[in-house]
Structure formats: structure tokens, C-alpha cells
Amino acid sequence: MSGGKQHNAVSIPVNREQRSFEKQRRDLLTGLEHGGGAHRGNSIAPYTEDWPSTVDNWIDSSWKRWDDDMRRLRRGMFALLPLDTFSIGILENPFALMHQMDRQIQDIRERMGSLDVPSTGSVNDFLKDAYEVGEDGKVHFKVRFDAQGFAPQDINVTSSENRVTVHAKKETTTDGRKCSREFCRMVQLPKSIDDSQLKCRMTDDGVLMLEAPVKVDQNQSLTLNESGQVAVRPKSDNQIKAVPASQALVAKGVHGLSYVDDGSGGKRLHVEVAVDPVYKPEDLFVNVDSNRVVVSGRHHKQKSDQHGRSSSFAEFSQSYAIPETVDPLSVSAQVVGNTLVLEAPLEKQHAITH
């Protein structure tokens, strides 16, 4: 036996939900709306001081865009693919299998010319929407699989080495003869989640939901943008003082996108954006949208004097195309003088040769 580190697969029980996916979603929003979650407490203060109001706004927006959100969530579900379409050599290499699965779904989408075909599930496609408020009012990692036609006992879910595998077996009987087919899907897990707490549920209309809490640095400030995506706020002056010098970001004086060495043979994304002094750290947001990193700011100021009340509003948004995406929760951002500096490790794509 090899002396290398072994990555044993951990089985994740599939629990049956006695409700539909839509009902589960409604119950989530209603529970948070009625104060059932912990987002009003002090247990998640490290996110931001205004996190409770951020969650309240997200709940209101989710109700208003209900139909659009349900379509988006269903389009983003992972499809289970038949294993008999893949070669044995591919099956023995998990990263090659994930790559091949992505290509197969993309080919189907291109042939059909439809966005209604389930997402490729590649890093570029799903991480931007993989974080959402959970029942406890905190940010959770959530992915969903279209498992219609399967029962919970037909599905085996395992996690190993930063990936999760959904394996399903389906038996049919035609003219007295039994036929069995196996389906599978692998998804690479981001390092920002607590994979020891992965939970799996299956709704009564065939949606398999995988969920886990996230690990957030105590000095990291999370918020939600207008689309409900998780965004990172730059560290405040007090937070920067608490950061070790080795982790402090440095402005290089080159505005825009560049790359820096990460010290271990890889590359980190480095972006510098000049910001007007009117913007404070709490006015700025960084989020990831597919293969783009987006920096935006919004400042609203009200003033009262003997002539009455007046208000001013300023905003900006800049985006930068990147060759590979990043995990939104891996972004580190600081304001250095009048420059917003952000860095994040690139999600490594495993090259496949053919």
C-alpha cells in the first residue's frame, strides 16, 4: 500500500423532505422573515454590523423576484449523467470525469440552443450563486441536483478530497427484463466551506439539495449585493490593524487587473481600483460573477439645515474579465489611501489532455 495520504470517502445520508422544492424555499423565507433565524442575534456579528438589515432586504427582494429566482435556481441545478457514456479510463480519474461531464452538458446546450438545459456545473458557472442565506441566518454553501425519477434510497452521496460525488442507480423493467443504469455527477468543493457538516436533503419533487456552513475569517465582512450574491466589503481601518503584516495587501500603483505569485508556485488575482474619497469601506463591494470580478460602490448622504433636507447619491461599478474564476469567499480587500486593493487565489482548473 502506498505511504501517501489516503482520502477516504465519507458517506452523506440523503434525508427525505416531505415537501416540494418550492415549498422548502417558501418556508426558508418565511422562517427568516418571522425571526426564526439567528440573523438578528449577535452570533454572526463578524459579517457586518448591518447584517440583520441586509438579510431583511434579501428576504424582501426574494419575494419580489420569486418567479425569476425559481427559474434561475432550476436552471442552475446539476444534471446527473449516465455513466455508460464515459470510458473506463475516465471513470478512474475524478478530475477528468468532472471535465468530461462539463463538456457533455455544454455540447447539449449548444445543440439545443437553450439556456433551460441544466448548468454545466463548472467552477465558472456555479460558485457565483453557490452561497446563500441559510435557515440560521448565516451564509451557507448550497448546490442542487436534478434527481427526478430517483428515490433517496437510489442515491449515494459521498465527499472526498474537496469534491462531492452523487451516484444514482436506476432499474427499469421492460417486457419482463430488468435493466439497470447508473448516473453520476461530481462537483469540486471550495475550501471556504466546512465539509465536515455537509447535509443532504431530497424534496418530494426530485431536487437533491447539498448544504454546508461556510468558514469565514473573523476580520472578513460579508454582505449581499442587489442580486442576492454574496459580496465582500473591504476591511475597515480597525480590521486592517488586526491583520498580520504578512497578510496586509500592498498597492503597487498599477490600476486594473494583474497577477502576483502566491509563494507556492501559483498565482493570485490582484486588482487595484482608484476610489473617490467620498466612499468609505462600508460603501464598497467586491463580488464574483462567472469569469468576472466586479467592484462597485454606493454612497448616500443626507444633510439637514435651516433650508430643509438635502441628499446626495453616488455610485460606480467596474468589472474585470479573468481567465479563471475565484471563490467569492476567498477574496481579501482593503482600502489603501484612495485605492481599493483586492487579491484572491485563482481556482485551479485541472488540465485534461486528449
UniProtKB/Swiss-Prot annotation:
- The ranges of region (Disordered) come to 1-21
Signal peptide start and end residues:
none
Its Gene Ontology biological processes? protein refolding; response to heat
Report the GO terms under cellular component.
cytoplasm; nucleus
- PROSITE patterns named among the record's database cross-references: SHSP
Q: Does the keyword Transmembrane helix apply?
A: no
Query: Which family, according to the similarity comment?
Result: Belongs to the small heat shock protein (HSP20) family.
State the name under which the record lists this protein. Answer: Major egg antigen
